[in-house]
Structures are given as structure tokens and as C-alpha cells.
Design a protein with these regions (language model features):
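Short catalytic/ligand-binding loop motif for oxyanion handling, primarily in non-cytosolic enzymes
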Residues: 12-16, 35-36, 70-73, 91-96, ...
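PAPS-dependent sulfotransferase catalytic core
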Residues: 1-56
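Short beta->alpha connector loops
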Residues: 8, 65-69, 176
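The conserved 3'-phosphoadenosine-5'-phosphosulfate
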Residues: 31-39, 84-94, 111, 156-215
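Conserved nucleotide-sensing/catalytic segment adjacent to the nucleotide-binding pocket
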Residues: 44-74
Length: 216
């Protein structure tokens, strides 16, 4: 019912928590880790799945990587689903991803480039090949370590989503906006609880370190 097309590190963990409060069990990168879905996503991005709905059994929504980069396929698979483009300022997004999920430092490498888990490395290579493409269709070199290139890719991605999705089906959302625009878009009442704020940069870096400790 809800497809998240926004990049990771745009408040997707908070958005996941909010959607679940509203009654939409939500698939996130956390579920890829929990359910061992990395190999499925690698295959999906390289040869294509039998059914794009397969990993979402029991879920009513999805946000974050890797599913976000498959939003065109998910829109076809779920033609009545609404689309949320979670976003933030491009400079703060680039700073966040360089410190966390695409950190160049070996001890804090992300889920998507994890040298300690070959299935995640393959999945990461496959979905980054979709995201890290220049206007000519080739892979953009060096972008992972360059703030300006990352910002350009982020802005390009957001522009492509806005162009691809009918405005009546799309919510452009920053988690700082809180409940009102999200609930209005989904047609549900505003809950009597604070909007969740989770998974800041410090917390995410600790998640990555914990994953290393678990797998090494």
C-alpha cells in the first residue's frame, strides 16, 4: 500500500516506525538483515525475480534501500500503492551517508559494501549500480567519497522520482514535518503520540559496528 522511493539516510527508520504506528508493517533494510534477504535482492537486481512481491509477505509498506531503488517495478506490481519520497537537504544527506552507510573507512563500512558478508557485498554492488549512474548510463566513479557528486546524485534521484510518479500518488516528505502531511496522504487519523525520531548518525554507526562484531 505504501512504496518508499526515498534514499537511505532520509529518515527512513523514523518513517518506518511512524508507518507501523499507523498500522502499516514496514519493510526496511533492517528486514533484509533479519530475514537474510540479501541474496534475493542481488538476484532481483541482476536477473530479475519471479515476483517482486515475494519479500514483502506480511508487510503493507516498504522504505529505505534496497527496495527504494526498485520503486518502478514495485509501482507496477502494486498499481494502487501510494509513493513516499522521503528527503532532506542534500548536503546533510551526503555528510550522513559518508559517515555511515557508504563510509570509506573499513571499520565502519556499510551493510551494502560489507567485506564480512559476501551476500551483502553482492547485493550492494547490484543496487548501487542502479543508483550510481550518470546521465549517460555509466557508473559515476568516485561518487561514494565525494560530497558534491553524492549531492548531485541525490538531487538527480529525487528529480527522477518526481518525474516518474503521478503527483496524486506521491508525497514528498521530510520527517521534520511530523504526522500531519503523512496522515493526510494516507487518509488515517493523526495518532496521539509523538512522531518517532530514531536512527540518527551516531546510532547508525553503532549498528554498523555491531554488525561487524557479529559477523567477524
Amino acid at each position: 500500500q505504501v512504496i518508499g522511493a526515498g534514499c537511505g539516510r532520509t529518515g527512513t527508520a523514523s518513517l518506518k516506525a511512524a508507518l507501523e504506528i499507523l498500522g502499516f508493517p514496514c519493510y526496511h533494510m533492517f528486514e533484509v538483515v533479519k530475514h537474510g534477504h540479501a541474496s534475493w535482492w542481488h538476484k532481483a537486481f541482476t536477473v530479475g525475480p519471479a515476483d517482486w512481491g515475494e519479500p514483502f509477505d506480511g508487510f503493507r509498506a516498504t522504505v529505505d534501500f534496497p527496495a527504494a531503488v526498485a520503486y518502478p517495478e514495485l509501482m507496477q506490481r502494486y498499481p494502487k500503492a501510494k509513493v513516499i519520497l522521503s528527503t532532506r537537504k542534500s548536503d546533510s544527506w551526503a555528510a550522513s551517508v559518508m559517515e555511515t552507510i557508504w563510509s570509506p573507512q573499513g571499520k565502519e563500512r556499510s551493510w551494502v559494501g560489507a567485506p564480512w558478508n559476501i551476500s551483502f557485498q553482492r547485493m550492494g554492488n547490484a543496487f548501487r549500480a542502479r543508483f550510481f549512474r550518470d546521465a549517460d548510463g555509466g557508473l559515476t566513479s568516485g561518487a561514494i567519497d565525494d560530497s558534491e557528486q553524492l549531492q548531485a546524485l541525490f538531487n538527480k534521484w529525487n528529480a527522477e522520482v518526481k518525474a516518474a510518479v503521478d503527483p496524486s500518488r506521491l508525497l514528498i516528505f521530510e520527517v521534520s514535518q511530523g504526522w500531519e502531511p503523512l496522515c493526510a496522504f494516507l487518509g488515517v487519523p493523526v495518532p496521539d503520540v509523538p512522531f518517532p525520531r530514531v536512527n540518527d548518525t551516531t546510532e547508525m554507526k553503532e549498528r554498523i559496528r555491531a554488525a561487524h562484531r557479529h559477523y567477524i
